Amino acid sequence: MSDTVTTARATARFVRVTPMKARRVIDTIRGKSVEDALAILKYAPQAASEPVAKVVASAAANAENNFGLDPQTLVVSEAYADEGPTMRRFRPRAQGRAFHVRKRTSHITVVVESQKGSAQ
């Protein structure tokens, strides 16, 4: 078994986007090459695509700078959005009522790995 590292990871915590909306974006890039994933995210209409793109770019930079991996061969092997803490707020309504507003946060994690043969 060789000691060469072929994976790198990046995490963005407490991102102000709901996990469900982040997962919708993440599902489109899982298994794609990093270049393809960034191109998809650049033109995706969802608001969650911007923080996900930053995490993908950070994971690719970690792979290149920390482990010396070739950025051309990187593939998004794992990507997931876990639920972070929920901020609870009140929305004033008529006649003294108050509705609850839940401002959800996400922890977005992306793992990239080097495919030695060819990028997808």
Curated annotation (Swiss-Prot):
Cited Pfam families: Ribosomal_L22
Record's keyword terms, sorted: Ribonucleoprotein, Ribosomal protein, RNA-binding, rRNA-binding
GO MF, one annotated term: structural constituent of ribosome
A biological process term (GO) from this entry: translation
Keyword Lipid metabolism tagged: no
Example of a GO cellular component annotation carried by this entry: cytosolic large ribosomal subunit
UniProt-listed PROSITE patterns: RIBOSOMAL_L22
Tagged with keyword Lyase: no
Role: This protein binds specifically to 23S rRNA; its binding is stimulated by other ribosomal proteins, e.g. L4, L17, and L20. It is important during the early stages of 50S assembly. It makes multiple contacts with different domains of the 23S rRNA in the assembled 50S subunit and ribosome.
Subunit record text: Part of the 50S ribosomal subunit.
Family listed: Belongs to the universal ribosomal protein uL22 family.
Protein name: Large ribosomal subunit protein uL22
Lineage of producing organism: Bacteria, Bacillati, Actinomycetota, Actinomycetes, Mycobacteriales
